[in-house]
Structure formats: structure tokens, C-alpha cells
Amino acid sequence: MNAAYQKLCARLIMAGVPDARFDAAQLYTFVTGRDHRLDDGPTAEEASRLQVLAERRAGREPLQYLLGEWDFLDFTLKVGRGVLCPRADSEVVCETAIELLKDSEAPVVYDLCAGTGCLGLGIARAVPGAKVTCVELSHDAWP
């Protein structure tokens, strides 16, 4: 068993992080580029980075911010401070909009306060004739 991964899990569980094992696995792979189940352990540099990220996550910084990106529908978005993290319920909203718009010839869609742009981008990818405009005024939301 990978001791570093176990330590990372224990730290996140102790901090009360929801889905601590999932988060630990994501952080481990992000830092090392390897699967914790098949790895003997991180290098000293990787262990140091893992410790820093574990403390940030234990402090409730969103996993998506730590990773810098997050999958949404069938694509990956840049994510960071200044935007809300795309979540599963955002995918449901986007899928519902796609279902409503898919048979329209040239729907016009405005994604206001777009943040990552996940809703507008998801619709644009799935409804080829859609004219989609994403609007975000906050400079903090721009990568």
C-alpha cells in the first residue's frame, strides 16, 4: 500500500473533507502523474508538493482550484479563483438546455455571469447552429 497516499487520505479525512479518498487520488495523480494504486510512493519533491496541496484542501480550497482544470460534459475547463467550480448540477442544467435547443434552427444563447463559460461552451459544442455569447465582467474569472 502506498504510505504517502494513505497519509494524504488520513489528513483529508481528519479535516472532514467530503470525498477525501477521491480528492487524495486526484491530488496524487496531479502531482506525480502516476496512479497511487500502482506507485511505490512520491519523490521527496512530490511529497513536499502533496503536503502543501493537502493543507490547502484541508482548509477547504476547492479541489478544482488546486488542479487548475475540471472536466465538464465532454471537455475540460480551466478553473481558478474567481469562478464557481463547474459541478454535476451545472451539467444537468446544460444538458436540459441542449435538449430544449437541439431542434431549433439557430437559437441565440446568452450565458451571463459566465465564469468558466461551461454552460455556453457546452451548448455551443452540442448545438452546432447556436449563436452563443458568454459574458463575464469579473477580471478574476479570466484565466
Which stretches of residues belong to each language-model region?
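Non-catalytic accessory regions of SAM-dependent methyltransferases
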Residues: M1-P42
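Charged catalytic carboxylate motif
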Residues: A4-K7, D23, R49, D89-V92, ...
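A general structural signal for well-ordered alpha-helical segments in protein cores
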Residues: Y5, A24, L50, R60-L63, ...
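Secondary-structure boundary/capping signal
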Residues: G16, A20, D35-H36, P62, ...
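Conserved AdoMet
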Residues: Y28-E99
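Conserved SAM/SAH cofactor-binding pocket of Class I
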Residues: V92-P143
